[in-house]
Amino acid sequence: LYLNTMTVEDRKEVRPYYYKTQMEKIKGIHAQITGNPQTRFTIEELSSMYEIPLTTMKKCFKDVYGDSIYSYQKRYRMNLAANMLLQDKAKEIQEIASCLGYENPGKFSSAFRSVMGLSPVEYRFRKGEILDGK
């Protein structure tokens, strides 16, 4: 029993190593996504634009930002939409969808619900009431 406790290793998370050039490319990809929320980039486009192998890009991005590129991009856009819904209540949902690159408001509503748990209309109503103190 004593020997078993002596051989137990601390299980520390091993962080992968990435080259500086890879990290710069991943930061560039992040800036591309956050700077252009109206555009839905495919991973193939990003890989080509930043000249980084697809597998390396996907793994590195997830290790750095904690989510896949697709999920990060979607969550980022829906958080922007949530802010827009509450900041400008006169702006129509279709207009917000269009600002974020969605041509179909139904697809936007579906994406919004999958991230926020409420439709854009419900979100605006419920969160707006909380902010207004009602």
Task: Say what each PLM segment does.
Residues L1-A31, G35, D63, D67-S68:
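Short, Lys/Arg-enriched, Trp-marked, Pro/Gly-tolerant hinge/linker segments that flank
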Residues K27-G35, R40-E45, D63-E103, R126-K134:
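Terminal helix-turn-helix DNA-binding modules in bacterial transcription factors
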Residues E45-I52:
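Helix-turn-helix
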Residues M49, C99-L100, V115:
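Residues within the alpha-helical elements of helix-turn-helix
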Residues M57, F61, K107-F108, F112:
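Short hydrophobic/aromatic patch on the recognition helix
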Residues M116, V121, F125-E129:
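Extended amphipathic alpha-helical coiled-coil/heptad-repeat regions
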